[in-house]
Amino acid sequence: MTTETTGTNATGPRVEAIPGGLVRLGARIDRWRTPTDPTTGVEPARSSSPGWLRLIGPGIGVVVGLILVRGVLGGGLPEGDDAPYHVAKNLFAFSEIFGRGHLDGWAPTFSMGSEQFLLYGPGSALVASALRLFTFGTVDHPTLVAWVGALGYVATAPAAYFFARGLRLGRVGASVVGVASLCVSVPFGTGLAGTFDLGLIPHQLAVPLVLVTLGALVQVVESPDRRWVTLAAVAAMGVTVTHLTSALVTLAAFAVMMLCHWATPVRDRVRRPPSDGLFAAYRLALAGVLAAGFGAWWLLPLAENPGPRPSTATWRTPPFGEEVQRLLRTRLWASQVVVALTLAALAACAIWLIVGSEALSRLGRWRVAVVAAGPALLVLLYAMYHVLPGDTGLLMVNRGTGYAALLWILPIGVVADRLVARRSDRVAMALPAALGLIVVVMPALVPASGYAHRAVPPRPELQAAGRVLADSVPPEGRFAWVHERGFDTSFGPVHPELWLAMDSESATLNGFGGETISPVDTFLQYRLASIDPRQAEPLLIRDGVTHLVGRTSTLAAYAEQPGWRPVLVDGELTVLEHIDDVTLAAPLNDQRTELLAWSPERVRWRTEGAEELVTGLPAFPKWHLSIDGTAITANERGGFLTARLPDAGRHIVEATFRRSRADRLGVAITLVFLLARFGLPVVRRRRGTGPASAVSEADGLAADKDRAEKGGDDG
């Protein structure tokens, strides 16, 4: 079968009406396969299908995904426990960090403040900011958070298609995998449950990037084309600066896949020389170096300031056997229908693998990985849970469950390819289209599909408190939600303090998980309901707390103190305001301190009457102190930045947050890598002085074009 390059199909009607750009895009997508057939050692024949048909597979997944998340596309805050937090974080990043030309900075928004992107990078915030610029500021930040979550979910389908094609699945099988990936819904992250139930927006944004990274790394192993190396590096960098835990899980997943690849017997008629393995290892190493270079602007500051951090992952992880039973018998990661289909496909592929069926022959040395990588990854993650210290292992096994599930569904695509092996492309693509229609008509196949909608407004009392805080909390101050079991969730949002921080655009003493880690966290907000208000008073003054929000009966004891007054009493919810001005410093005997100036990264006090000033700023290495204009060495007391004064007289103390040498060096390294990989080759090609590799790359493109003219059908 041949295809003429003039646009006329030898076996069908002419296709001149199809736009040339669409045809070329389809051809590029169809090139997502390995360059050599594992059984013959030669280039497989290309499909004679027009380019537009090759877009059908990824397109089905995109359409299904958009339909499933249509409830959050119209605007407003999406459902999700943590969604208000991401709104507040993105708002501060857009206005105070990116708006000032920085990639990171000090954010006082939560707890006692932290470097905004020290633990989890700015990937999600950058995407939200880009969308805001693209819409000329007409879209509010709550809507942008919904769009970012929807983008991460919808993009999962074409990313899964790309990954499956890299593993040698046909277009039909890869399309089925793309649709099935939308049915993976894990509350710990990945899918609709994690995105619109818990609100793990950055995690979901990282999911398609993880799949693209794995697919590109597979191609790096198989193909000498340097473009795969670049794609793998860029995608890996994107995962790392978006969700660090996902990057670690990606490494674990690819290690499992490579172990399966290495352990798979070679059936190739034309055996590759040992040097091919060395060159593949070189390309993988190059991809790793490029990824580190591209992400140096964030990785170097992370390495410079790794902690300390309090424990934040406090939930219980069940034993391995119990977890497996939950995966198989409950809706932990998918509906029971999808679980049954996955197990049936996995069993069929395992039998084909044992008997050496031709159904898996096209997968080459990836056939074992397609069958076993999902279960093996889950085992590895549980092993790491018991080995890695602190929260790292716990986060990996919880956040990695969804990625293991995405590997589990690969056998479904293999079975789909087998079912349509003798059908034409136009007929075969009806299978993923039908599956997509079933998912749309029966959304219950996707756990938590009902959460993809606009969040329900909280009770009027909480909305009133938000308006009061917006009007009365000064920029240098913060409010504290007084936690009480059974009271916090009675107003609608699971985290009312996060909703108040978002709605009032105010800082809060309440910390939030691993993404807002402060070098010091007093956890005072959890003790305010039980300790004596007189004992809490100096701590609240040091922390800059100007307002308390909590149960009316609980705050009655604070309202009796001379320094507090009620500004809102609405049923069982009360807001108290501190009468004195904010000092953001610990009160000491006979010491008089006044806050002269405040900005997120520069604070100035006037103090007298003591020989030290204990500030309300965490003792973070990038905070620098000066006394009367002279730089001094910063000290710390109880985790707080402390200035040792020369005497008890009047002094001006200033704290300044400065970018470190690692920040500047990281940006410089990234710029050098970007210039070396993208800038210099372009200049050399334009001058006609490019290296031989550039010529070989061009020859490879020409060879691809020649092969595309030969035609064929890959099913």
Feature annotation, model-predicted:
Residues 619-622, 627-671:
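Beta-strand-rich ligand-recognition modules
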Residues 78, 82, 96, 158, ...:
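Extracytoplasmic
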Residues 704-706:
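Intrinsic-disorder-associated, low-complexity terminal segments enriched in Asp/Asn/His/Tyr and depleted
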Residues 710-712:
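Short, Lys/Arg-enriched N-terminal segments with co-localized hydrophobic residues
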Residues 16, 20-34, 268:
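Short hydrophobic helices that act as membrane-entry/anchoring signals
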Residues 4, 9, 25, 37-469, ...:
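Membrane-embedded transmembrane-helix bundle of lipid-linked glycan/lipid transferases
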Residues 8-11, 16-18:
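Compositionally biased, proline-rich intrinsically disordered regions
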